[in-house]
């Protein structure tokens, strides 16, 4: 079993998907959920699954480095970090401690639509395909090596919420498969 941490900031659908995925059950040990938002509903999901939760509000720290050092002290035995809707940019200092061991899932076909509100921006641009990317995290926001992508043709009879749900379905299928590949190839 490989010790991992999952970082999330919101509802936690990707966190829950990874934590309950039967194919990952014998491969990863989720040592903790790291959450930067004390009001995030992902915290409740972690409690239901008896997964230790580290709630770290950045507002309680003097600097980003102090915030990240505190997290690092609490996850020192972890081998990989999987970001699942974590809405913070990770500093070069933190990245240096987990070089090549932090993976993110992003709701766009990178390199298109980096950053926030990717689905909405792609939808408003009336793109033919919307998709997801799973990538290693580096110093450039959503700029790391792409590990996997998937997409679907957009039906503009659907609402933005319906398209967003389809994106989440892709995420829930592809993220576990990609994690398995990463961990079994290394």
Across the structure, where does each feature detected by a protein language model lie?
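Alpha-helical structural signal in soluble globular domains
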Residues: 17-24, 45, 49, 74, ...
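Short alpha-helical
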Residues: 13, 40-41, 62, 88-89, ...
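N-terminal Rossmann-like dinucleotide-binding module
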Residues: 1-41, 45
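Donor/substrate-binding cores of folate-linked one-carbon enzymes
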Residues: 21, 87-186
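Short, surface-exposed acidic-centric catalytic microdomains
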Residues: 26-70
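Helix-adjacent hinge/juxtasegments
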Residues: 54, 62-105, 110
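Active-site-adjacent beta-strand anchor residues
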Residues: 7-8, 35-36, 83-84, 88, ...
């Amino acid at each position: 079993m490989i010790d991992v941490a999952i970082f999330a900031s919101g509802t936690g659908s990707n966190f829950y998907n990874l934590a309950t995925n039967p194919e990952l059950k014998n491969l990863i040990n989720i040592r903790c959920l790291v959450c930067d938002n004390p009001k995030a509903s992902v915290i409740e999901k972690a409690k239901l699954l008896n997964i230790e939760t580290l709630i770290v509000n950045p507002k309680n720290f003097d600097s980003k480095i102090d915030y990240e050092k505190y997290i690092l002290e609490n996850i020192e035995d972890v081998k990989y970090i999987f970001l699942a809707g974590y809405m913070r940019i990770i500093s070069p200092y933190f990245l240096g401690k987990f070089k090549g061991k932090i993976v993110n899932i992003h709701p766009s076909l990178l390199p298109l639509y980096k950053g926030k509100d990717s689905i909405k921006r792609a939808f408003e641009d009336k793109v033919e395909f919307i998709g997801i990317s799973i990538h290693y995290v580096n110093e450039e926001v959503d700029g790391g090596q792409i590990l996997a992508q998937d997409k679907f043709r957009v039906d503009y009879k659907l609402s933005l919420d319906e398209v967003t749900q389809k994106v989440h379905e892709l995420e829930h299928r592809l993220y576990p498969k990609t994690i398995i590949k990463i961990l079994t190839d290394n």
